[in-house]
């Protein structure tokens, strides 16, 4: 099993997509790197902690390759906008891949270099990960009728899985 971390705006959106990918066995929303120990969501929302909202993705490489996960990641968010995804703005919403081994780093760099657009996605070695509060875990599945889910996450799911 391998682990990687994707930051592509609000972690609820990223989590909802990857939950539906065969070979992904566990997801945990949380916060990567930054300068505050064990931050809360309220801390992150200030935009001053240096953390990114991320989803920790645990996957079986024999069922889904890291390259496939990278392709999905780049399809489900805009990697050309700095510190913003839609109306979510701030460094906590930046596009980043927090890799856990040299092969992930190499594949991520290769993929970015092959893209024609100017990509702002950061490719950073994971330093530290803090799980988000429980109410952030499995958010879309537990709150699919909430307005944010209906307006942003559901259309993203429909677009990705019905193309």
Swiss-Prot record:
A Gene Ontology molecular function term of the record: L-methionine:thioredoxin-disulfide S-oxidoreductase activity
Active-site residue numbers: 10
EC number of the protein: 1.8.4.11
A GO biological-process term: protein modification process
Pfam families per record: PMSR (PF01625)
Leading EC class: oxidoreductase
Organism domain of life: Bacteria
Catalysed reactions listed for this entry: L-methionyl-[protein] + [thioredoxin]-disulfide + H2O = L-methionyl-(S)-S-oxide-[protein] + [thioredoxin]-dithiol; [thioredoxin]-disulfide + L-methionine + H2O = L-methionine (S)-S-oxide + [thioredoxin]-dithiol
Alphabetical UniProt keywords: Oxidoreductase
InterPro entries named among the record's database cross-references: Met_Sox_Rdtase_MsrA_dom, Met_Sox_Rdtase_MsrA_sf
Similarity annotation: Belongs to the MsrA Met sulfoxide reductase family.
Role summary: Has an important function as a repair enzyme for proteins that have been inactivated by oxidation. Catalyzes the reversible oxidation-reduction of methionine sulfoxide in proteins to methionine.
HAMAP family: MsrA (MF_01401)
Name this protein carries in UniProt: Peptide methionine sulfoxide reductase MsrA
Source organism of the structure: Ruthia magnifica subsp. Calyptogena magnifica
Upper lineage: Bacteria, Pseudomonadati, Pseudomonadota, Gammaproteobacteria, Candidatus Pseudothioglobaceae
Designated gene of the protein: msrA
